[in-house]
A protein has these predicted regions:
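Conserved, mostly hydrophobic/aromatic
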Residues: 201
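Strand-loop-strand
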Residues: 186-189, 348
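Elongated, acidic membrane-bridging lipid-handling scaffolds
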Residues: 1-165, 171, 208, 224-231, ...
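Flexible, surface-exposed loop regions and adjacent strand-edge segments
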Residues: 237-242
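Outer-membrane beta-barrel translocator domains and adjoining extracellular loop/strand segments
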Residues: 182-184, 235-236, 278
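Short, proline-centered helix/strand-breaking motifs
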Residues: 25, 343-348
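Surface-exposed extracellular loop regions of Gram-negative outer-membrane beta-barrel proteins
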Residues: 174-182, 346
Length: 348
């Protein structure tokens, strides 16, 4: 009875509580993860939760994460519901992540990411209604280096800055550790060599909270600047005949359903080289100074024969100016694209 605070059974009531601890060192259930915390504190009076010098280490494959500070401020727990919780801000500062592979005695490879800054603002969770509200997500880090395709490529990003519904990536480079002439000999399927450099990528009005409720990502604007795509096909190496997927198939099969209101690409160059069977020097075809505007950039099918439209212009082989409109199908079941192009005089 909450009016009299009397009961025939055990009765417990509280308004606020707090706790603090030091030098925590123990395994999580299952003993696969070990957690060490130098200092921790929680207060519902002040509405904060703070952990200092946190390390999370996995028993297998040497996974390790550490950060000098994890804090949660402005914690709000409604009195009328145990299914709801909110907070003003979550901070994770200067996080370091590393993962090593190898045998019991030898580490063969280690990947790491340092200087991770993560923050969440104005979060409210209702477990009963299964709703999630988020004011802002902030993530900053630099010098990202991710292995791809079993180490035959690495994705390098000089800087990542996500805040206030905007994302910026600087100095993006997809690069292989093998030279373009030896790549196809090293790659098990003898695939073509690629190298892609991007000056920066910028997205605005990224609706992250909306994604959690609709499972669709809505982006206001996308800008891609200063792109150099290089490709070499080595005909000296025989390969099984195969169909090369079209570029738009990657958009259709993307793991995230998305819609981008406006998108553009500026200063885009392509260099295609092909080494013939009976030759020592590759031939070259190149496009430079290309600029393009997208409309209807999405992989969400809304009506039959729906297209993404790309209006572009640039130069072919350094002298032939061209304009083109490329219509790409949104629906994977409609396997047809349309291309309307015009090339001015070309003098080779």
């Amino acid at each position: 009875d909450e009016q009299t605070n009397r009961s025939g059974q055990l009765f417990f009531k509280y308004d606020h509580f707090g706790l603090s601890f030091r030098d925590f060192d123990n395994y999580l259930p299952g003993k696969d993860l070990r957690v060490t915390i130098r200092k921790g504190s929680l207060s519902t009076v002040n509405g904060f939760f703070r952990l200092q010098d946190v390390t999370l280490a996995a028993k297998k494959d040497s996974i390790r994460f550490s950060t000098p500070l994890i804090s949660l401020t402005g914690i709000r727990i409604p009195k009328n519901s145990i299914y709801q919780i909110g907070f003003d801000r979550f901070d994770l500062s200067d996080g370091d992540f590393s993962m090593s592979w190898g045998s019991d005695t030898t580490i063969l490879r280690t990947e790491s990411q340092k200087d991770i800054q993560l923050a969440l603002e104005n979060v409210f969770v209702d477990l009963k209604k299964k709703t999630f509200q988020l004011g802002d997500l902030q993530l900053q880090t630099k010098d990202i280096d991710i292995p791809l395709d079993n180490g035959f490529y690495r994705l390098k990003i000089g800087g990542l800055d996500l805040r206030e519904s905007g994302l910026r990536l600087d100095h993006v480079h997809l690069v292989s550790p093998y030279s373009k002439m030896e790549f196809a000999y090293k790659q098990p399927k003898h695939q073509d060599w690629f190298d892609v450099k991007v000056g920066n990528v910028r997205l605005t009005d990224v609706d992250i909270p909306g994604y959690f409720s609709t499972k669709e990502l809505h982006v206001g604007g996308l800008w891609i600047n200063d792109v150099l795509l290089q490709n070499l096909k080595n005909r000296k190496i025989p390969v099984e005949p195969h169909i090369v997927p079209m570029i738009y198939e990657g958009l259709q099969k993307a793991p995230v359903r998305f819609k981008i209101d406006t998108a553009s690409i500026a200063n885009f160059s392509v260099v295609y080289e092909e080494l013939p069977v009976k030759g020592d020097k590759p031939g070259k075809l190149y496009f430079t100074d290309m600029n393009g505007q997208f409309s209807g950039l999405t992989n969400i099918v809304s009506y039959p024969e729906q297209f993404i439209r790309l209006h572009a212009d640039g130069n072919l082989m350094g002298s032939g100016h061209f304009t083109a409109t490329w219509q790409l199908p949104v629906d994977s079941l409609y396997d047809r694209f349309l291309l309307d192009a015009r090339l001015d005089s070309l003098d080779l």
